[in-house]
Amino acid sequence: MSFTSIKFRANSAPKTTTSLTLTRSRSTAAISPVFLEARARVKEHARNISRSSAHNAVVSQTVRPTPAPAFQQLPSKISPPNPAPSLPTHSDIPLDHSFVGLSGGEIFHEMMLRHDVKHIFGYPGGAILPVFDAIYDSKHFDFVLPRHEQGAGHMAEGYARVSGKPGVVLVTSGPGATNVVTPMQDALSDGVPLVVFCGQVATSAIGSDAFQEADIVGISRSCTKWNVMVKDITELPRRINEAFKIATSGRPGPVLVDLPKDVTAGILRTPLPFKVTTPGSTLDLPSNPLQTPVRASSELELIRQAAQLINQAERPLIYAGHGVLGNPLGPKFLTQLAREGNIPVTTTLQGLGVFDETDPRSLHMIGMHGSAYANLAMQQADVIIALGARFDDRVTGKVSQFAPAARTAAAQRRGGIIHFEIQPKNVNKVVDASIPILGDVTENLAAMLPLIRFSERALWFKDIKEWKEKYPFVYVKSNPEKGEKIKPQEVIEELDRQTASYKENVVITTGTMGFGLPAAVGAKVGAPNKTVIDIDGDASFSMTAMELATASQFNIGVKVLVLNNEFQGMVVQWQDLFYDHRYSHTRMTNPDFVLLAKAMGVHAIRVRSASELPEKMKEFLEYDGNKPILLECIVESNEHVFPMVPAGKALHEQILHSLLRDKKQNTEA
């Protein structure tokens, strides 16, 4: 099974707070003896790099290869080094002397303190050792060492989703950096703030195919909001500030800062303006018109038009995505809009949890594997209010046949699609919006709410009620007396039953295969007093299973629920439906997950029958919250996920569960 998800529920453990005073700028005299000793080692290391670089330049200058394109702006070995960037000399500009005499690694440490970083996820290596040496035994933040850099990236994602702070990743050059590409792409797709720092070979060796050299700036250009190589130690504080600013501005996302070894090992000799060393200061960053958010004040006329369209709508529908979760007030304002306007709500997969699923106005998830009634409602709504969603193909189905009623209403000027979006580039990218409202979704909702009027819409809710009754989520339960394996739905239902009392404190998120376990570890680090549950398929779990050892080593109390069907479930479903049951390389031969977990010091239990599920689930949930635990459920191999909208089909052309198909055929007969 390839599904991966993590689920967080609040428990009754008392919350503790730790008071920590951070010094925003430090003089040399304030540095601890550990740092003074570390600096001496770093200085000697910097001198060695300088000597080695000079020697290598003489030896190899006649055969130096052409640099890779992304590095062509760097100084070559045979050209004199670029002079240090010119700094303001006007006596009125205040200068920060606290970094003078510090190595690049020590400056990195101090900048993490100034940005109030509490946790870093990463893996050391030669090119990043000056930074790791500088943070050695630091008491100011915790470092989590995963078993693989991909794990570090996903841990930072989980941490960011729960804490609201950017996740910080620190890895070495070459393979260390490239192993974080998947988490960065995942974070870019889902709008998760990550700040990734990676080591790089010395600037004098760039372009020479040096040991573990990789053009990570070029490689990561398409999977980050912004990336940069720090070419001089005087740039380091500014680049770190820029990274945190860009990662959290507008639609959040990942950024990458490439740190050559001679920059992190070098020593700063000149003071820097406070403007570039102080977090939150104006950095005069260039703006990208396709990413720059627009404030609500510039959209007031469009907001009034949108409210008027909503008030006159007969069949409106709210389509909410992950963007609503970007602000703590987002779910509150969404609920207010739904109730005050009496409007049904459907959400994307990433938007699950943004609206109360037990509310009668909830249509649950929409799209390829969404509810049948949500898909039908989208096709018949005359006004669609899209909040923080981007109309991806899993939601729209066949675009030319998406939301036909809203398009007809738009042509008649009585309806259409209202798109609340923070990034201009996402407007009209897939579906044309009748009224695009740019800017922060929460701010714009706050401006529109006073203009919304209540309407009964009896006929609309009558249709929705009939769809819910006609097309519910269904499955056939297992029969333990016949030795049948558990259905995965039974596991999820039992989990839901035993955690129902925490309904108001649930955060659900999903990611790529391999995301679940490390993301849950990061989430638990960010919210140690919460219960964090990773719901994983066996195929997804296998990709990052070694991170159980990380949870064990650092006493991170995640709960890992593995649904083991010995198949790559989603792919197998396609092979059954569209490829004549030809299971091309989708069957898994798994290790004994219980023994594997125990080998890593993790308590593990297994369930084979539905009759023992309640007892084992109770043990799983009540296990020590400071230690990891694994529950393996052996589930039916051929259970599929329905409804399903086939690729290239419209939402109303969805495939229903066989029980509903048979019922529909009998009714028509």
Could you describe each region identified by the protein language model?
Residues 108-109, 113-115, 131-135, 466-516, ...:
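Active-site diphosphate/adenylate-binding microenvironment
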Residues 257-265, 465-471, 634-638, 647:
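A short, charged, Gly/Pro-tolerant segment at domain boundaries
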Residues 3, 30, 35, 39, ...:
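Conserved acidic/glycine
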